Amino acid sequence: MIENLSKLISEKVSSELNYDNERKEIIQYGTYALIQTLISIISVFIIGLLFNIALEALIFLFTASILRKYSGGAHSESSNVCTLLGIIISICIGFLVKSSFFTKMNFEIIVFIGIVIFVFGYFIVFKFAPVDTKNKPIKTEKKKKRMKKGSLKILTIYLFIEILSIILYYNLGWSLVKSVMLSIILGVAWQCITLTYIGNILLKTIDSFTNKLL
């Protein structure tokens, strides 16, 4: 369905602007990716609203997705399965962050977990990123360096958000800060895991199981 819609849009645009086949394929790929992204965001938002976990699930989704854009990582063989897994994992993380285990957790422990995850994150990104796939190979060394640099910049932005959250918590006592911090921490952790061999095996296992169900 998504593929047919993106193909229809690309053909319409290419026809109107008199584009060649190469440009048409680029438009089709971009449209396909955009539709999948919108489906993920809207699905997570609606399901999140139903269970009062929209903020946590969306923060996790955006955190992992933005870092993934630069760092790459293991992918499902099917883009549809990949989208479905992203939605499911985001919702599960939303429930986890809102669980009594984390809501009752001491703030200093959350800060400690954050420190550990960011040290782990910088190490993994510096060592492995960007991780390409068969479908999306990174062909030039220049692009690899640019993507690694982008990954480190994104990770640093997340770190500054965490530091700002800590300052806000201690100065204003905003309890919402805990949820925001945990969602970012878990988003960083998950994306960095997908850059590793273990993450690749894990996603392949989930992918195989999901394909059998579908």
From Swiss-Prot:
GO terms for cellular component: plasma membrane. One of its GO terms (molecular function) is peptidase activity. SMART domains: AgrB (SM00793). GO terms for biological process: proteolysis; quorum sensing. Its main location: membrane. Its EC number is 3.4.-.-. It is an enzyme of class 3 (hydrolase). It is a multi-pass membrane protein. SUPFAM superfamilies: MFS general substrate transporter. The keyword Lyase does not apply. It comes from the Bacteria. The chain crosses the membrane at residues 41-61, 82-102, 109-129, 154-174, 182-202. It is found in: Cell membrane. Keywords: Cell membrane, Hydrolase, Membrane, Protease, Quorum sensing, Transmembrane, Transmembrane helix. It holds the Pfam family AgrB. May be involved in the proteolytic processing of a quorum sensing system signal molecule precursor. Belongs to the AgrB family. HAMAP family: AgrB (MF_00784). This is Putative AgrB-like protein. It comes from Clostridium perfringens (strain SM101 / Type A).
